[in-house]
Amino acid sequence: CNEHGGTVLNAAILLNGEKPVVVKLERMDELKVVFDSRDMDVHGEFEEIGELQRTGDPFDPFALQKACLLACGIIPMKGHSLKEVLERLGGGFVMHSEVTNVPKGSGLGTSSILSAACVKAVFEFMGIGYTEEDLYSHVLAMEQIMSTGGGWQDQVGGVTPGLKYITSMPGIDQKLKVVHVEIPEE
């Protein structure tokens, strides 16, 4: 899509009648960041900012969550003290995430959808207003931070309800145009 642009027709679906990705943040008094991935059965507690700024390890089960905090500007890309950052936020927090009914490597864009769910949860937790375009651009930023180069439209599919016609123009800066397609009930 960088050379020629891209066009995709995409539909969001429920799996077994449920949204397969859930992310929730909870505030806590302790000045640390906790990630809890229920589907992967991993739990991590972070008290040093440097640990949260490292996202390049493909085997790190929390690389995606760390990239979210960086892309959203919650954690600075370099320097600073986690204690100071969390004091300004009024305390630490736990980010719970769970992906259900979707096998890894299914091709359903689960990592992009999880990324978007993390961004949305952070924005809502912080009281930051956002648009669909904000979600898309932050997920693309996360993919750049992690150097994963995910699908340019994956995050649109599962985050934006219904049937969508998605296009992008050629170029590095991928601005997505999303047109919601109405389907008559007949």
Model-found features: residue ranges?
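Membrane-interface helix caps and helix-loop-helix hairpins in membrane proteins
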Residues: 148-149
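Short alpha-helical scaffolding segments that buttress acidic/His motifs in well-ordered protein cores
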Residues: 139-142, 156
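Short, active-site-adjacent segments that bind or coordinate small-molecule cofactors and metal centers
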Residues: 154-161
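Short, conserved phosphate/pyrophosphate- and ester-handling motifs at nucleotide-, phospho-/glycolipid
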Residues: 111
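ATP-binding N-lobe of GHMP and related small-molecule kinases
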Residues: 1-108, 120-132, 137, 161-163, ...
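Active-site signature of alpha/beta-hydrolase-fold catalytic machinery across serine-
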Residues: 117
